[in-house]
Curated annotation (Swiss-Prot):
This is Probable DNA-directed RNA polymerases I, II, and III subunit RPABC2. It comes from Caenorhabditis elegans. Residues 1-43 are annotated as: Disordered. It comes from the Eukaryota. SUPFAM superfamilies: RPB6/omega subunit-like (SSF63562).
Amino acid sequence: MADEDDYQDMDNDDFVDDNEMEDVIEEDPQRPDNEDEDDDNVDENFELFDQGKAVPTSEHVTTPFMTKYERARVLGTRALQIAMGAPVMVELEGETDPLEIARKELKQRRIPIIVRRYLPDGSYEDWPTDQLQLADW
């Protein structure tokens, strides 16, 4: 450990006296004096993008198979919900792991989650998990 004696030789040249510091506030010449920073007119600072349109269920373009990426996201999301205290949609037989419970719910098609698939034209399709087929079970 270092003793206080080791630091006795240090000069305080690197430290500036607080009394020498001056606070300078620069005013923006372009801004009128009566404008506050908390104005409600902040809409002009950003651009809104068009929302995509939903494709009707009867006109789905994509396949009804759940991809491994969708499966991973659905299971992870549902496991997090279960871990945070969401009600379980299946009968528990001693399972305590939220991920195992989510897998059991997915096998029985009881997960209350909708998968949204975005299409290249900006539109999207909503698929309930009970309508998607699981290929690798």
